Amino acid sequence: MRKKVLATLVPLALAAAYGTGALAQEAAEAPAAPAAPAAAAASGDVAANVDAANTVVVTGFRSSLQKALNLKAQAIGVRDSIVAEDIGKFPESNVAESLQRVPGIILNRDESSAEGQRISIRGLPTEYSVTTLNGAPVNTTSTGSIGSAARGFNYDVFASELFGRVDFYKSPLSELPEGGMGGVVDLQSPRPFDNPKGAVRYSVTGAYNTMSEKTDPAAFGLFSKTWGNWGFLVGAAHSKAMNNRSGFEATGGYNSSARGSKTPVQGNFAMQLDYDDPRANLSGYTRDQVDNALLPRIYRFYGSSNDRSRDGLVSSLQYKDSTLNVSLDTMYSKLKNSRDELYYGILIRNSKTTNPSAPPGTAGHNGLVPIDVHIDPGSNLLTGTFGNTSYSSGVTYSEDETKFSYASLNANWKANDRLSLTGQLSVNSSKAQSYQDTLSGQIFGITSTIDYGSDHVYPSLSSTSDYLNPANYSGFGIGTGLTRETDRGRQGRVIADWDYNLWGEWTGHLKTGLVYVETEKGVHKRNATSDMTTKLNGLGNAGMRQGMVFDLPISNLDMGGGWPHQFGTFTRDYTYSTFDPLAYNTEATFTPAQSFTATEKVTSGFVQSDFKGEVLGHGLRINAGVRYSRTELDIDNFKKTGAGGAYEPNQESGSYHNLLPAISGAFDVTDDLMWRASFGKTISRASLSIIAAQTVVPNPFDNSATAGNPSLRPQQSKNMDTSLEWYFRKGSLLSAAYFRKVLTDATVSSTTQTTFGALGLPDTAMGAIFYGPDGRVDPNLPMTLRTYSNAGRQVLKGYELSYQQDFDFLPAPYKGFGMLASYTHIDPFNSAKWITNAGREIEVNSVPKYAYSTTAYYENGPLAIRFSYNYKGRSLHGDNPKNNGDDLIRWRAARGYLDGNISYKINDNLELRLDALNLSNTLSYDYFEDATGQYGSGKKTRMDYAKYDGRTIKIGLRGKL
């Protein structure tokens, strides 16, 4: 029964979610400087049912869906749109979360806030798409991606109320900016003449998160008014949110003593059980069974609290008459995160006893002793008692901030009925900064009992040692770092549109233009770990123990019943006052291997034409064109030179050009059945982080490094799309699409096993958890080195199914129901083959093989209800793209999210709204599958980064004056 109810409610919500985006607004007027995607829609008739729908006046979700459907039908290529229900009323609080309902889009969430952050399109990574703002390419980053220098776009920087419409293009068009092999997403900001009558909109909301048990405010206000030919719009948004996360971490893998003790190490970390200790007891198992059983890299609890604030401003000054449309648009956004993280558990990686006379638990005498152990059916050694265990109690306190600003001057002049000229000048800037301290202490050489239990997310841990005695803690360590990433862009374009007649009733629309885009990305890193370590050593164990507290610095953490709820740790106030990360890192020497500035200058020209007419009484629309671009790249970085390996300033430059043809067609098979097809060539440029940077450690608390390659070529793709779209009723669509991309020169990664000493990096490249008692990183520490190169030919293909229907044919009171659903399937696509130790090839997929989204809604009079469910399948984890010798495949587990909202119009000017996010309280986690099939999938027995985010409930008022 519950499944039947859910199956009914879920579809109802999807249409609503989409609906809020596209329904209540009048068809948006062409912006003063039409976004490249916006201009691609063909003028002309669409399917009969779509035309008929335009004559029906509806509001709310249904109206939004209908407008999005109209835009899709009018386009010649493959385009989907989400339109604000009304000015300042976008479907979701986050643009990326609205986009995930579009077939082919898979959402990537920020791990700290659980908000939608980036999107991947049709199986391609996030940096394979281009995001534009009113047609101009923009870049920005936030939270965990600061310093990655990727080309992707972080949507969580912006409040969705700042936008009026989003267009998403999957098929190539000559007018679209190059670089988006996956697609182009165009964000369009509102302008006053979008609603010439003027508007004053506002909303106030309180949000409660069940994990943090905190309530946070959000507010939005917008004023828009026109005076004759002049108009002005200004809007502001503010929100706060506090989210807690908690669960189990293995921190990157599982391994056995048999493989971890080999030279070189098999698996992703070294470890060796100590069978020579007199306490060793195999509990009835053979030595071989225990030796081959799997243990996690670290067995620990993780908890975090992320305090996020976001502020945004949007404005537009517009002049519009019958021939001239000029606007000055601006946007500003600031995103701040204060993140508190704590962890407590047993260190298993790099544990080995070679010197029994050393203090128990310290380097050389830290091999775990099996005393009373149990091996589960998956050959995991996750229950039992072990001697000589060492605990690490750590905290990381982080601050990150992103400031984005944008200004654009746009003009459109209608010279006559056939010719119009458009010009745009825009600038944008994104400045992001992140800094943090990680402070830890250890308890060495004690006996512990662990039990993975049935929950696995909150296992148990106990010991005879006193966790509350500060004298038991020593081996204190500190790690820190500061990263700044900047993006600056300048863009100018001039475009001419000309309508012309062809033979018979055929007409054409020619568009040609010149575009110049200059972008600069800089990454600047500093690390004061050595200076802080000097101070820590000066304080000594006694001084550090005085700074410890035993009540956890993060409140309301769900830890389960079997984990210690009190242990020695450090507060944010103590950590920052004793080791001020901003002061220390600002004065520290910058990290040359990870710092660079790269400038790209792209000059492009394009010409394309739409052709519209009939063939045998059936409508046919064609768009054909070509785009030429020349790219110049200048890099300023630092390179090792000479026998001493010192870093010296280095400059590199290069250029290349591309010719990118594209053709699309839409054919009306019947009045309500449309066939589309498109062919074209696109490119994507490799991430600047792997072009401009030297050998770096992206995550100082993970033993993996990345080496850049300045010789990488841009990746190219030849694309084919075809689809059938059946507009079978007003407000309804059933469609099926097939896509195929042939990629050449794709950027692929390969990994090799090496040691930290062989990388030639300073100790400060690694986090404090890797430091020995001497304050240094062991040069023999196993490291995974990832390098990049251009691959040969690869093929990516898949299909998409989409369904949308307004059930207005039902009798009252069921007439208000509607549904929206989509399904995407991507054939397994991975650049590297996954080979078992026995030589068998395993089919793996680097992106989810399938994803689906469904929304059901009900709208009747003042009441509207919506539920949405979005699901994506499992995918190969990028940190473990191939076999490390342990036959374990690391998967990102499949996951689905259920959201809902209820709104009630108190009157025409005021609406009460209730939103519920992540109603399913979805568990996000990785797991390690045994590729041989002998020890099971590991889906519930070898989990990693398994955490709950909790549910968020929002209640608020939205109104207009």
Where are these regions (language model features)?
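Outer-membrane beta-barrel translocator/receptor signature
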Residues: S145-F153, E161-F168, E175-L273, D307-G312, ...
